[in-house]
Amino acid sequence: MFEASDVMELFPSCLWLHKVSDSSKINEGLMRAVEEMRAAGEGNTRSSGKVWMSPTNLLEYDAFLPLSEFIIPAADQALGFMRYKFDHFYISECWANMNGTGEIHPRHSHPNCFLSGVYYVQTPKGCGAIVFHDPRAQAAVLSPQFEEITLQNSDRHYLQPDEGMLIMFPSWLEH
């Protein structure tokens, strides 16, 4: 019937998943620094009182410099994978979020950025997944029943994080 058949992935949305070496040691120092910032009243708390966000300049603090030691190589790897030509890049912002039980962040993207990332310092039992949404608006015009939900037919992907996990993704990808 066919001489040849193939599947071509068109406009893929890539995630780069990393498990950071010696993350428990790094996480201990990061958590201590975050707790000190929060106790000092730095950052913002949402009206519910269960969500806290640090200032966005964490890499200006010595305690957070270990982050750049693995974020920069991960970004370099992602840019290389996409075959972009670049001489240098920089991290424009870096912040910490702490969510109370049952709290979530509203669906969002990161405008005026190229790559974004999430690093997990703590993932308590029962913590929520990060949810990535299909960026193709027209993909949802018809939703047939599925034999099985796969990456190819779903309009969102739930990724359960682990401590020490770094996820890099295009900044336009809503999560």
Feature names for model-found ranges:
Residues 90-96:
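A short glycine-rich, His/Asp/Glu-containing loop-to-beta-strand
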Residues 1-87, 104:
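Non-heme Fe(II)/2-oxoglutarate
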Residues 89-90, 133:
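Short, surface-exposed recognition loops or helix-turn segments adjacent to catalytic cores
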Residues 22, 136, 173:
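A broadly conserved detector of short glycine/acidic/proline-rich loop/turn motifs that flank catalytic sites
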Residues 103-104, 173-175:
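Histidine-centered metal-chelating micro-motifs
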Residues 96-168:
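Catalytic core of non-heme Fe(II) oxygenases with the double-stranded beta-helix
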Residues 12-14, 92, 113-115:
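Residues at beta-strand starts and edge strands
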